[in-house]
Amino acid sequence: MSIRIIPQDELGSSEKRTADMIPPLLFPRLKNLYNRRAERLRELAENNPLGDYLRFAALIAHAQEVVLYDHPLEMDLTTRIKEASAQGKPPLDIHVLPRDKHWQKLLMALIAELKPEMSGPALAVIENLEKASTQELEDMASALFASDFSSVSSDKAPFIWAALSLYWAQMANLIPGKARAEYGEQRQYCPVCGSMPVSSMVQIGTTQGLRYLHCNLCETEWHVVRVKCSNCEQSGKLHYWSLDDEQAAIKAESCDDCGTYLKILYQEKEPKVEAVADDLASLVLDARMEQEGYARSSINPFLFPGEGE
């Protein structure tokens, strides 16, 4: 099954009135998203060997919250939604959607917000980005979207991605339409922007027990059934790993068919789990999975592969 977004004027009357039994798509809920992430990162930093980096990531997440409200986006996506629906493509496809100057405006605002909090190498990195030309910034953005991580240093990538993510999340939040689950391919990618997940979460509340993958760019979540590989959709050779016990709130789901893994966070075990923060704070589990010979099928927005990785 894949997910397609249907324009408002193409919805049937029943689709306008009622929601699907299982919502295939959860658009980003931007209110307090970044503050909640920052708080969770700071909480997880306590007694964590990666504490300093988690606090660094929390500073970026908090800056995203500030910039989100200081620089709102106004955009009519109606035409774009119709075109993408007709083509069966993600409406905010990172590989084809033209970027306007708004994302670079967001980057400069993030840098201004972060400067007083940064020192040493981190300050030098954002000052370097501040001096970069418009074209240089566009080239780095294009390289990240093409997974050409050797062209963007791993210390610059989180700042570039933070601005791009804000921009794409703002656009996703403006999408007029409704998602419909249909037969198709490439369920492992975000149906809104085509980017990769950061992790998956088994939720509580109105979506109790359902698993949703969380986009590492536009913050959208999309439904993928449990006990099925999110990367290749096979189900015969899955294994579940944790550092604690069977009741752990964070597990890695590995697949011997494709050789990859993705983390699953369980809200019923820990209601405060957050897709980005808890993934970043559990890198010890990633190290274990690498030792077992599995490759990660996701990317955390605060941790990009360096050259040669």
From Swiss-Prot:
Pfam families given in the database record: FdhE_C, FdhE_central, FdhE_N
CC per GO annotation: cytosol
CDD domains: FdhE
Keyword entries, A-Z: Cytoplasm
Subcellular location(s) of the protein: Cytoplasm
Main location: cytoplasm
An MF annotation (GO) of this entry: ferric iron binding
Gene Ontology annotations of biological process type: protein maturation
The keyword Amino-acid biosynthesis is assigned to this record: no
Domain of life: Bacteria
The keyword Acetylation is assigned to this record: no
InterPro entries named in the record: FdhE-like_sf, FdhE_C, FdhE_central, FdhE_N, Formate_DH_accessory
Function: Necessary for formate dehydrogenase activity.
Classification via PANTHER family: PROTEIN FDHE
Homology family: Belongs to the FdhE family.
Protein name (record): Protein FdhE
Gene symbol of the encoding locus: fdhE
